[in-house]
Amino acid sequence: MVVKIKGKVFVFGDNVNTDEIIPARYLNTSDPQELAKYCMEDARPGFGRRDDIKGSIIVAGENFGCGSSREHAPVAIKAAGISCVIAKSFARIFFRNAINIGLPIVELKEADEFEEGDIAEVDLENGVVRNLTKGKEYRIRPYPEFLMKIMEAGGWLEYCLKEVGE
């Protein structure tokens, strides 16, 4: 079960919208690996093609994932190898889409205390976020058991298929 996530932090600001996460000009495919190449392209050109983003954590400000309701946005993030997104707040539809595809996301009002390159650790089950670089610890609402099961399965569809198969 995915309980603890640890990775290098990449910082983004407030109101990162779905067009910045995966620009519409790249939506001519639904292949996650193709989408991954253009992850965050309009917010930080070339980000999705960096070698050092696998296993990393995006930390952002308010209203992450605002804009259109395209599911491609969290798919691009997950396929790029981002292990978790921490933000002060999320657009509701992005939040739901991320959970549906098994991308862990965490709301943390102190997200702005992280800096680019910090090492973060997220404990979904116990509700703790740590900035290991700065030695700080923050409490968050732990993921309920059913969300942990969705994350473990890899997303909502996979969870449902597993439940039907049992």
From Swiss-Prot:
Listed GO MF terms: 3-isopropylmalate dehydratase activity
Pfam families: Aconitase_C
This protein's record includes keyword ATP-binding: no
EC number: 4.2.1.33
UniProt KW keywords: Amino-acid biosynthesis, Branched-chain amino acid biosynthesis, Leucine biosynthesis, Lyase
InterPro entries: Aconitase/3IPM_dehydase_swvl, AconitaseA/IPMdHydase_ssu_swvl, IPMI_Swivel, LeuD, LeuD/DmdB_bac, LeuD_type2/HacB/DmdB
Cystine connections: none
Catalytic activity of the protein: (2R,3S)-3-isopropylmalate = (2S)-2-isopropylmalate
GO biological process, one term: L-leucine biosynthetic process
SUPFAM superfamilies, alphabetized: LeuD/IlvD-like
Class of the enzyme per the UniProt entry, highest EC level: lyase
Pathway(s) of this molecule: Amino-acid biosynthesis; L-leucine biosynthesis; L-leucine from 3-methyl-2-oxobutanoate: step 2/4
Transmembrane segments: none
Top-level taxon: Bacteria
HAMAP family registered for this protein in UniProt: LeuD_type2
Record text on subunit structure and interactions: Heterodimer of LeuC and LeuD.
Similarity comment: Belongs to the LeuD family. LeuD type 2 subfamily.
Functional note: Catalyzes the isomerization between 2-isopropylmalate and 3-isopropylmalate, via the formation of 2-isopropylmaleate.
The protein's name in its UniProt record: 3-isopropylmalate dehydratase small subunit 2
Organism of provenance: Thermotoga maritima (strain ATCC 43589 / DSM 3109 / JCM 10099 / NBRC 100826 / MSB8)
Lineage of origin: Bacteria, Thermotogati, Thermotogota, Thermotogae, Thermotogales
Encoding gene, per UniProt annotation: leuD2
